[in-house]
């Protein structure tokens, strides 16, 4: 594990854009207790939908009936989350049932590591939420070709989904390599913020954990600052520390290539008290 110094002095200015200077009073996230009625917080999107190529396998998985059981809602366009208010119920008729440990991955990208984790823990149920159709399709295709029965995929905004779920519902929430929103004027879009973590922790079970990883140094320090100051979460590496990559989080090709070039990757695991 590693420890960071004060966030305002820890980041080499050479790694920042003109807009991405060290955090100042206007950029630091408010750490005051959030109101109980967090369901009514105005949401600023943490993602930007991009047009990307969809290969034939991904398109097949989004349209062919043999993959339909992986897709919880409409996988084209803006995902309609109406009625999705219990992730455990999605597995009621599957081998693991609804009482198995439950992991929610937010923004699984193309799904490679998500599928690898689900295959490695067949007794755990995995739900992935994503907004990009090519990634949703590829993930469903890989799940189908491996005949996995512990995966469900949702198209839509993760924050909106979390607001609809019961309290103390999920055992593990993971957020790997989220968009760092590098420009200072976009910091409000960063997923890890006091407002959004109030929604995330509400859905976590007591004793459950939030695991995040980033390869963007400034965002890493931002996250540890926010999360260490958030009541109800405990840094499993100790306050101010990052943890080594746990064995259960697969290393992606992109991550391995970055490490070979000397880029850093920072993991954080927080337990809900």
Curated annotation (Swiss-Prot):
Coiled coil: none annotated. Disulfide bonds: none annotated. Substrate binds at residues 183, 215, 252-255. Its EC number is 2.1.1.33. It comes from the Bacteria. The active site is at 179. GO terms for molecular function: tRNA (guanine(46)-N7)-methyltransferase activity. Pathway: tRNA modification; N(7)-methylguanine-tRNA biosynthesis. The keyword S-adenosyl-L-methionine applies. Keywords: Methyltransferase, S-adenosyl-L-methionine, Transferase, tRNA processing. S-adenosyl-L-methionine binds at residues 105, 130, 157, 179. The keyword Transmembrane does not apply. One of its GO terms (cellular component) is tRNA methyltransferase complex. It catalyses: guanosine(46) in tRNA + S-adenosyl-L-methionine = N(7)-methylguanosine(46) in tRNA + S-adenosyl-L-homocysteine. InterPro entries: SAM-dependent_MTases_sf (IPR029063), tRNA_(Gua-N-7)_MeTrfase_Trmb (IPR003358), tRNA_methyltr_TrmB_bact (IPR055361). Belongs to the class I-like SAM-binding methyltransferase superfamily. TrmB family. Catalyzes the formation of N(7)-methylguanine at position 46 (m7G46) in tRNA. This is tRNA (guanine-N(7)-)-methyltransferase. The gene is trmB.
